């Protein structure tokens, strides 16, 4: 087996428990990958950084707020463009909570944000591109899993964290 290179990343789907709405961001038209699409917070893990630290750093950079990581929705593996080693990315997807009244300041990576119910998000995410379809699957999973989890389990997971060091 040959040793290759890939990047690690995170995604943060942010949920407002009080309104049961999800936060979506529109990517800047200046972005090199998937410009103008609606997405959740995404970003790369820096060298020497854990997934949890990357999650909180990326959310602060993109939104100017801190979130509570509630649980891991899943993992992802994709190519950011052509299927070449330099475009390969593996990542962890978190569901995070944030009060909708929080003062969000979007970075230059995005042009706007919206709080949407799952149904509203599905309507907005009408493009057939792979990134949009991925975001739809993430929201669909979150909206299915969240009601199944007990408050005690979600509290335990959010308080103890996810990394074992």
What is the meaning of each model-derived region?
Residues 1-23, 95:
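Conserved N-terminal beta-strand and adjoining loop/helix that marks the start
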Residues 2-6, 34-37, 84-90, 110:
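A generic structural micro-feature
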Residues 9-10, 50, 111:
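Short loop/turn microsegments at loop-to-beta-strand junctions
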Residues 14, 93-97, 115-117:
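Short, well-ordered beta-strand micro-motif
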Residues 20-61:
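Conserved Nudix-box catalytic region and its N-terminal flanking loop in Nudix hydrolases
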Residues 66-75:
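A short coil-to-beta-strand element that immediately follows conserved catalytic motifs
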Residues 77-103:
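Active-site-adjacent beta-strand/loop module that shapes the phosphate/pyrophosphate-binding cleft
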Residues 108-165:
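Nudix hydrolase/Nudix homology domain
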């Amino acid at each position: 087996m040959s040793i290759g290179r890939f990047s690690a990343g995170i995604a943060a789907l942010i949920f407002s428990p009080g309104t049961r709405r999800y936060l979506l961001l529109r990517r800047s038209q200046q972005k090199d990958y998937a410009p103008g699409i609606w997405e959740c917070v995404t970003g790369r893990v820096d060298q020497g950084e854990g997934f949890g630290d990357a999650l909180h750093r990326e959310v602060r950079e993109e939104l100017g707020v801190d979130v509570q990581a509630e649980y891991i929705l899943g993992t992802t593996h994709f190519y950011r463009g052509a299927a070449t080693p330099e475009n390969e990315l593996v990542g962890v997807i978190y569901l995070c909570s944030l009060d909708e009244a929080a003062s969000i300041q979007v970075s230059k990576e995005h042009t706007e944000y919206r709080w949407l119910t799952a149904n509203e998000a599905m309507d907005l995410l009408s493009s057939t591109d792979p990134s949009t379809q991925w975001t739809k699957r993430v929201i669909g999973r979150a909206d299915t899993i969240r009601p199944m989890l007990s408050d005690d389990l979600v509290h335990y997971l959010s308080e103890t964290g996810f990394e074992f060091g």
